[in-house]
Swiss-Prot record:
First and last residue of the signal peptide: none
Identification of the protein by name: Large ribosomal subunit protein bL12
Single GO term (MF): structural constituent of ribosome
Gene Ontology CC: ribonucleoprotein complex; ribosome
Pfam families: Ribosomal_L12_N
InterPro entries: Ribosomal_bL12_oligo, Ribosomal_bL12_oligo_N_sf
Keywords: Ribonucleoprotein, Ribosomal protein
Natural source organism: Salinivibrio costicola
Length: 38
C-alpha cells in the first residue's frame, strides 16, 4: 500500500490545477466536501 509520504511527494509534483482537479475527484468519489472548517 502507499504511504502518506508517497502521496505527499506525488501532490508536490503536481500543478495547482492538477491539485484542484484531484480534490474535486476525491469529493466526488467519497461524497464529501473538502472545504476547510473555519
Amino acid at each position: 500500500s502507499i504511504t502518506n509520504e508517497q502521496i505527499l511527494d506525488a501532490i508536490a509534483d503536481m500543478s495547482v490545477m492538477q491539485v484542484v482537479e484531484l480534490i474535486e475527484a476525491m469529493e466526488e468519489k467519497f461524497g464529501v466536501s473538502a472545504a476547510a472548517a473555519v
